[in-house]
Each structure stands twice: as structure tokens, then as C-alpha cells.
Amino acid sequence: MGHTALMIAERRQTWVWIGAGALLSVLMRLRMFWSPVSVDEGGFLAIARGWSHGQVLYRDVWVDRPQGLLVLFRAWDWLSGGSTASIRIMAMLFGVVLVVSTALVVREVAGSTAARWAAIICGVVSATPVLEGHSANGELISGAVAAAGIVVAVHAGGRHRPLLWFFSAGLLGGLALSLKQSGFDGLTAILGWLVLRAALCRSERRRALKSGVAMLAGLGVVIAILMLHAALTGWARWWSAVAGYRLKTQSAFSGSDWANLLDTGRFAVVTLGTTAIAALVGAIIVVRPLRSHVRARMLPASVVLVLWVLTATGAFLVGGGFWRHYWLLLAAPLSALAGVALSHAGRFKAIALTALLVPCLAISGWVFVGSNATLSVRAAADRRSPLDEQVARWFKAHRKPGENLYVLCASAAAYAYAHQDPGYPYLWFIEVRDAPNAQNMLVSYLGDPRLAPRYIAQYQRASACDPSGRVDAILRQSYKRVTSIGYVVVYERTP
């Protein structure tokens, strides 16, 4: 067999492994398709629907996310014919993109063997339910797009018109940022690699600088579109939502929830711990020969993998909330370096892979064997989700045209299941409690004789989001209790 034929055979074999990793990611998510949509999924979907029905984004419906995420949810809702449950199919698709992109990055910078192992590892750890890998959250979606941007950038060197490729990588990096503010990891990893190339490799300096400018130009196109929409719909509201609010209430710079970091970190240790150890070995393999490369004025492309872990760690820390799905930001870059480590494991590769994945598979299996009613509770300790669809079903059976529902204080997925546009902007508990003027707006909404909701589904005590007692007073004076669904109490407005 000739050299060309061997290369073709090896490439095909690598694609088989990548396909296996992608299939694993789908199978890992398949059981969770029957679990209720999460608070975030339902909230994003309800806001996207309200926006498509004429509500003004960041005024009538509010979320601390850039517009790109809501555009995606609007598009998916249209394509799916308004199916709420189908949002999990979107999660599967982006999970496949993440696995394939991670493997292609590794193949380009570290070889086919490392790429094969990275695909399998990423297919499992990025889909684990205890890190909410099954849900269509911003970390999974933006991470997949960011990884695709890295693929385009590392492939640019040997391509015709490489600056166009880097421009495209910048576009993808911008799209990742438009989906989630923490989506900068792929973009900054490539820019860091280009800066190092420019600093260490004199012969590559001009090319690296041009490539960086092309990437920033691509990024600039996306940012310009976001800012144009912001200017047309309300610049101050947009800036407050996507930057100002989080900087003041919960980020790495203010209100970081370190207790939650310890709580969710327990699950990350089980699912990502062994992968992180292997990734450390992979990083040593990449970094060890750097001194000789630097002396020769060269910089291996595999350095991108180390930079990716560093930038993803930064993205994880910036959020400040440290929810379980934050850890998904680390799944792909850790898998990439773990693939490098396994490619150097000799005849112990299979044993190492088994040791790597058994903890993640074991805790995922514990979630999967539960009933449909307990899937969300086991996966994310979310006891609201199993009730959201029941509340929505009751509301749809009893409402008349023009009547609406308010969820007190918050359980955003109920709006998505009920196909009910929110009448109050804030759908998450932390915003109801902490957003500027949110409690006064809630009191005005519930007390308005014309706009007040016909039904209120009380998930939390009113005093939890309104310590002043005004909401409690409105419930006593203007509403009557009509039923209970689990622990949720449903009130109807009295004539």
C-alpha cells in the first residue's frame, strides 16, 4: 500500500473514531430527552417567543445574555414548530459540533491518534447529566461554536487565502460571544497563540499579526451587529443586561458564589477529575520541548491546546455563579489535552481510557436509572422542573382567551410549556430579588387591575423575593387559592 493510500486509510479511521465520539455524545443525552426542560432552557425559549411576538428585548422580557442566544432560540422554535421538548435535540446537535470540533483541533495540532482519544473522551464528559451536559445551555452552545472557530484558525495555515480563514474564525469567535459572555475562550486562545508566534518567531511575525487583525475584523463584524441592534432598541438597557448587571451582582468581580463553587465542584471532581489529571500530563508533553523550539524561533501549534485550557478556566471564573453547567466550559479543552496524554500511553491506552471514563459513566448511569420524574432531581437537584409541565397543563386547561399566568417568584420553564408570554420581565429568582426596581415593578404588575395575571403559580414564598410584604398583601386581598400541584399553590384573581 502506497504512502497516499495509507494516509487516506488513517484519515478514514480517524473519522470513524470521531463519529463514534459524536454518537456517544448523542447516546449520553438520549435518556435525558425525556426529562423536563431546565429553568434556563425554558426561560430562554419563553423570552425568545415573547420577543418574536412583539415584546421588546431587555425591556418587556429581560435576560442577562447577548442577543445571539435569543436569536438561536427564536430560530429553533420556528424550525421545530413551537415544540418545547425539541430543545434537547438542539443540545444534541451542538454536542456533536463540540466533539467533532475538539477532535479536529487535536488532529491538526497533535496528530490523528490524539484526536481519536480526544473524541471519545469529549463525547462522554461533555454530555454528563450531572453537569447539565444534556441541556441547551449557553456554555454548551457557545463552547461548540468557539471550538469550531479554533478549528478554522488552526486549519488556516496550509490553506489558500489564509486571512479569509482567520476572518471566518473571528466571525465564529464573535458568534460564540453573542451566545454567552464567557464564549471568548476559543478566540483568546488563538489570539494568544498568534501573539506568541509574533513575539518568538521573527519570520512569522508579519503573517501572525495580519492573521490576528483578520480575526479581530471578523469579531468586529459580529460586535457591530449586536451594538446596532442595541442602539435601535435601547442602548442603556442592553448594556445593563449584558454587562452592567452581572458586574454589579454576580461575577468574578462582585458577588462570586464561592460556596456554590465547592458544592458543584464535587460533581466536577467525579466527572472531570480523571480527565483533568490526564490533561495535566498532556500539557507537560506539549510544554516540555518548548525550550528547544523557542531557541529555534519556532512555536508548535499544539501550544494552542494549553492556551485553550487557560482561557476556558478564565471564562469559567469570570461568571461568578459557578453553576454546574459552568464546568462544561472545561470539558472540551481538558479532553483535548487528555487525548494527547493517551496517545503517549503505549499499550496502556485502553486501560487509561477506562480509568478516565468510569467515574463519569458511573454517576451518569446513576442518573439514567431513575424514573422520568426523578431525572432532573438527580441530574441537577432541580425539584421545580418536574412540576412545570403539570402547572402549564393545568393552566392551559383552565384559561380563557386573554388570561395569563405569573410564576411566583420564578420557574421560567412553566412559561415555555404553557406557551405563555411573560407579563413581567424577570424570569429568574436572582433577578426578581436583585435587579434594579424589580420588586416595585412586580408589585405594580400584580396590583394593576387591568394587566394583573389571572392566575399565579406560587413556587416560592412571596417574602423570598419581596421582603416588604406587599406581594403577600396583594395575594390575600386580590387572589384566592384554587388548587395545589405538588408543592405549587395556584391562585386565581378574584372579581
Over which residues does each language-model region extend?
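Membrane-interface transmembrane helices that cradle and orient dolichyl/undecaprenyl
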Residues: M7, G149-S168, V195-R202, T274-A296, ...
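Perimembrane helix-loop-helix junctions
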Residues: H3-T4, G186-G220, I284-V294, A336
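Membrane-interface alpha helices of multi-pass inner-membrane proteins
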Residues: V26, L164-Q181, L187-G192, V221, ...
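Short hydrophobic alpha-helices at membrane interfaces in multi-pass membrane enzymes
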Residues: H155-G174, E204-V213, P300-L310
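Hydrophobic/aromatic-rich transmembrane helices and adjacent perimembrane loops
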Residues: D185, T313, G319-A352
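Signature aromatic-anchored transmembrane alpha helix within multi-pass, membrane-resident enzymes
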Residues: L216-G220, S343-V369
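Transmembrane-helix motifs of polytopic, lipid-linked glycan transferases
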Residues: I89-A110, W117, V124, A148
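Short periplasmic/luminal acceptor-recognition loop of GT-C membrane glycosyltransferases, typified by
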Residues: L171, A380-D434, N440-P467
